[in-house]
Amino acid sequence: MKTIGILTSGGDAPGMNAAIRAVVRTGIYYGLKVKGIMRGYAGLVEDEVIDLNLSSVGDILQKGGTILRTARCEEFKKKEVRKKAYETLQKHGIEGLVVIGGDGSFRGAQLLSEEWNVNTIGIPGTIDNDIPCTDYTIGFDTACNTVIDAINKIRDTATSHERANIIEVMGRNAGYIALYAGLAGGAEMIILPEVEWSIDELCDKITYGIKRGKLHHIIVLAEGVMSAPELAKMIKERLPKLDLRYTILGHIQRGGAPTVMDRVLASQMGARAVELLLENKTKRIISIRNNQIVDDDIDEALSMKKEFNRKLYELSKILSI
């Protein structure tokens, strides 16, 4: 193998640049040429390929986002479009492709491997932490720290004004950001897709807190359950005198300098991706499980089901009495 390519696909996540850096520097260390594909699969289809060298990845370790940029590519579901992507790989002599992204990105890599025998390696990069085969994804820790910073600041003003605050965080189908940030931020209630909840239980908890002299109430809501305005309306219907505000954190969760954990994880995964290609292993997704870097067959990895950490959720309820 002489030349490898790398792309970032789907939603961006802090730490993607650290992974790109690791792939490029490890590849060069082993004597490989490294090509960058701009704008994910869309750029692969449209032949947006650049050369990457040591200078290309200098001073990016600490930066959020992705220097290769990213884009959605619905057209990639069509085989004739994927053929164009394969032709781009052939044109540039790319023998192995590293894909950084989430579930949809890996399914694209899976199809390239199945249809055109492309050597592919997946690196999980998404703030949602919803990839079944790995304990943590690149970007998750940074996103949680961003949310915690917001919770801390909102609590300051909530205490001053004796208010309740709803903080809506990302997570359409997975509530890991809500769970981890809610637990670490001391939320009175965490509302997420994986667990049933009761509006009456929430309002009873707020009422009890007021009676015992509590000055603030923090409710962390995953966006996939409902919107913050909808939840606020439900609460106000039951507690009309409650001073209630809501904050939708939105895309602030995707930006910012990656944490130490995300930088280290991305560096490990990026380096391992190159090593797997040099070992002639393909159709693999790299993961971290039990603090060890491992890899799985892409078909098996995509068929896994992520087990929700019920113990952490129960702990959050115990600690929020």
Curated annotation (Swiss-Prot):
Active-site residues from the entry: D128 (proton acceptor)
Signal peptide limits: none
Record's keyword annotation contains Nucleotide-binding: yes
Keywords: Allosteric enzyme, ATP-binding, Cytoplasm, Glycolysis, Kinase, Magnesium, Metal-binding, Nucleotide-binding, Transferase
Residues where Mg(2+) binds: D103
Activity regulation (UniProt): Allosterically activated by ADP and other diphosphonucleosides, and allosterically inhibited by phosphoenolpyruvate.
Amino-acid positions noted as binding substrate in the UniProt annotation, renumbered to this chain: T126, I127, D128, R163, M170, G171, R172, E223, R245, H251, I252, Q253, R254
Coiled-coil stretches: none
Uppermost EC category: transferase
Catalysed conversion reaction: beta-D-fructose 6-phosphate + ATP = beta-D-fructose 1,6-bisphosphate + ADP + H(+)
Main location: cytoplasm
Residues holding ATP: G11, R72, C73, G102, D103, G104, S105
Metabolic or biological pathway, per its Swiss-Prot or TrEMBL entry: Carbohydrate degradation; glycolysis; D-glyceraldehyde 3-phosphate and glycerone phosphate from D-glucose: step 3/4
Biological process annotations from GO: canonical glycolysis; fructose 1,6-bisphosphate metabolic process; fructose 6-phosphate metabolic process
Subcellular location, record wording: Cytoplasm
Entry EC no(s): 2.7.1.11
GO molecular function: 6-phosphofructokinase activity; AMP binding; ATP binding; fructose-6-phosphate binding; identical protein binding; metal ion binding; monosaccharide binding
Cofactor(s) of this protein: Mg(2+)
Assigned GO CC terms: 6-phosphofructokinase complex
Family listed: Belongs to the phosphofructokinase type A (PFKA) family. ATP-dependent PFK group I subfamily. Prokaryotic clade 'B1' sub-subfamily.
PANTHER family: ATP-DEPENDENT 6-PHOSPHOFRUCTOKINASE (PTHR13697:SF4), PHOSPHOFRUCTOKINASE (PTHR13697)
Protein purpose: Catalyzes the phosphorylation of D-fructose 6-phosphate to fructose 1,6-bisphosphate by ATP, the first committing step of glycolysis.
Record's subunit section: Homotetramer.
Name of the molecule in the record: ATP-dependent 6-phosphofructokinase
